[in-house]
Amino acid sequence: MRRCAALLLVYALTIPSNFFGADDAPLSGYSPRSSQSERDWEAKFRAIPDPANLREYMKRMSARPHHVGSPYDKDNAEWILARFKEWGLEAHIETFNVLFPTPKVRLLEMIEPTKYTAKLEEPAIAADPTSNQKSEQLPTYNAYSPDGDVTAPLVFVNYGLPEDYEKLDRLGISVKGAIVIAKYYHSWRGVKPKVAAEHGAVGCLIYSEPQDDGYTRDEVFPQGPMRNPNGVQRGSVMDFASNSPGDPLTPGVGATADAKRLSVKEAKSISKIPVLPISYGDAQPLLAALKGPMAPNEWRGSLPIPYHVGPGPAKVHLKLEFNWDLKPVNDVIAKIPGSVEPDEWIIRGNHHDAWVNGAEDPVSGQAPLLEEARGLGTLLKQGWKPRRTIIYAAWDGEEPMLLGSTEWVETHAEELKQHAAVYINTDGNDRGLLSMGGSHSLEHFINGVARDIEDPETKMSAWQREHLSDIAQASADDRKELRERPDIRINALGSGTDFTGFLDHLGIATLDLGYGGEDEQGIYHSIYDDFYWYTHFSDYDFVYGRALSQTVGTTVMRLADAEVLPFQFTNQADTVHKYIGELQKLLKDKQEEVRERNQQLQEGVFKATFDPRRPTVAPAREEIPPHLDFAPLENAADALSRSAERYQKALGTKQAGLDQQGVETLHALNAKLIESERKLTNEDGLPRRTWYKHLLYAPGVYSGYGVKTVPGVREGIEQKNYAEANQEIVRVAKALEAESTLIDSAAQMLEQTSHP
């Protein structure tokens, strides 16, 4: 959505001036003396990133297709390695061998009631010079679909989510033995074949609906930024949320040369039914051939056809075969050793692989990472020395499902548990507002960074612009909180990019940052995501790339140099209380929904509204969900609030003398702070998916990338497993109690330190 800067400025008059920070206030975790020195170094750093360099980095890295195992993927890794070394960082390439299937046979044809053979191809466009590199481009496909040869009636299932199948049940339609066709979006793509298989389907097609990223939203490429009739979204359909991301053959351990591997048949995360992505140009003849009930109004897209559900009379034949080969992924790892606490690590990452040329995804994020590294290298030559060790990582294999970062995390898990303080992630970057997500112990900290970054278009701070934009779009209740709460609430993280192993598996405090939201785009995972598209329809002057370098570079420096890691737990406690309220409302809403539906069944409402020309099946009567005992969770959250306030008070009284505390004292205190996020994990993991250890954040089993907060409890309620939800309440409460105890011990340590 485009925003009006004039409207935002009107709202600025309503915000207290102290919301925008003050340069003379000491930074969190710094004494006044070290704070001023830090601000001076940060100002020098923010003057370094250059849009001209970002443009050249993107042009170079996106010049050819660079998917996993391709020659240019390796070439880019070696080029990045050379740049890190040129700028004074210690650097090496770490290689893992992972399963990465590529297609041998792709056939989709309609055999009844008429004949149609899908093109399954994105043609080159004359205006777009890299779109013609066909011999190097991966075909349009979904990685980790199994081989398959199926012929079956077609059924349209909207977005292919569980609630869509509930609607099909009401229509009396089964997908058992059918091939389903689903729209992209509203969930991670791998959820669609997962749910289809659970309902008995034998195959799955996923198409890009023009209502979502095509001509309904703007002109199509090359006249505009949106997906044209032949554009296809490649992507992984690995069932990572129910199992784990990374190499399917080495779950839980690094995919090193000598790792013990499963067979492909033993790999649990490979999709259960064949899956193929198609364009809306190929989807239209298939959808037009469907009959049966008209699709519900909210299912209908913008193709010039009546949207029927089926089944049939359209019958399709889908045949897929893949090369099931191991391919190398090349992670580029660079290091700046810490001068005081080298065994505490600040890790910064972005991936470098793409499905094709990948200018937007991922190079628009990778280029700013490189410019950050160049900037820090420049500061090193001027005498700056980070207190902690900084690690820069250019991950490979993110697109197939976080292969490079996950294998690195699993290989180095014990080291990371001991040393990793914070992980900071970026991915694709565009023009617009700053998006902040991550661990809520870092919420106050990252708000402070955002206050110090200038938005390139409005010249107000990135924080102020985001804050005013939130007010412009908020409800009356939300506007009240936005105006009263000092910090913007940051997003909780699920998955979908390289922070997953750090946060969800190891419990390392994490941030995920990026700009965007102002420009439409419809080239995601297609051959048209390239330098031509980006420099015509996105951040073509690279000023938001520079802003990302400035934002994340400042974040890295501020974390690396602080005497005390700038964790703040009052915002985290507030967020936990908010999650508990959401869970209680979720349960209450479900109870009321079931109670009302049961009453309508008893009253005969469904019988009275039955239309024999449009027959539907009445829902089944259900037991009303039981009450859950949230008291342990509420008590634990209250304890966390008290501990957080105690720690904040203790830190405030000792902040002036932090630079005079001994290294051993500060190291012991920081070790507790690093451990705080780990306390929110459980070694047994989440129910039925033990790789995911974090009890507050996880990707949803039926949402994929989308986060489920307090996932064991929330998904227990959503999936009607109420006994399990009660058990998870107790587990989460114990984790919060353990974190509270740790925070109390950190507060006590501060209280007992001598005054400067």
Predicted region positions:
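Second-shell loop/turn segments in exported
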Residues: 40-48, 62-71, 140-145, 179-186, ...
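Soluble metallo-hydrolase cores and metallopeptidase-like ectodomains found primarily
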Residues: 132-167, 243-360, 374, 378-382
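Alpha-helical metal-binding/catalytic segments enriched in His/Glu/Asp
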Residues: 210, 332, 348-402, 407, ...
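C-terminal amphipathic alpha-helical interaction region
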Residues: 653-756
